[in-house]
Amino acid sequence: MYHYRVLNSASSRGGVAVVELDLSAPRGTGHVALPFTGSLGPSRRDVPDHVPFGAIAPERWLMLVDYKARLVWNVYAVLLAEGAPVSFDSVAPGSVKSGFGVRSPYLPGVRTFAAIPTEQSCCTKPNAQGELPNSFLFRVKGLTVAPTVRPPDMSLAIVRSDLQQTCGPLRWIADGAVCGRLRSNLEQAIASQQGDRAATTGSLPAFLAELDAQHGPGKPVSDNAYWLLKVNGEYLLAHM
């Protein structure tokens, strides 16, 4: 089970009304649906393949699967006789909304997500043509951790690639010394993988222990980096 919370910065100028999460998968994966908990709206059937998944939504939020195999959470809204729709709920600036979740047997990888503001945050004033702007034009994109890898496909090479991303462009681990220790332990596990199983099962726990030691308030390993590397590393250790 993947649990999420949406944090809207205090400097934001609008509430969040829609969250999109990419769950697409290579052709041939299929369209396996697991249970959904909460309000499920009409979903498209002509979507690309996606990882097997179900989802959870907070109260007054709706779920659906869109034409790009994205899981979409959106707030209930009321359509007024005049003007833009008004959201019943949102993630206001400076607030946090929990209760979002994805259930899937797939292991984590780096995925794209997007947040879209409420209509009343961005789109209540007509433009020069007398038209109201579309809130989807104000989409803000980012990266998170979500179901990606089929368990039999998980490998130390994938964990190494994830570590390179978290210590590199993602900056999910911003401490170079910590990255160096993690990289050293992981490289030892990879080097010994073909020969000395005992060495591999010794280096991998050291990698996981370093993650544990460096994760928490004020520490350099972010939640995204921790759960991405921890879950995949523990899976490999358990299946060696």
Model-found features: residue ranges?
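Extracellular or exported targeting regions of proteins
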Residues: 1-150
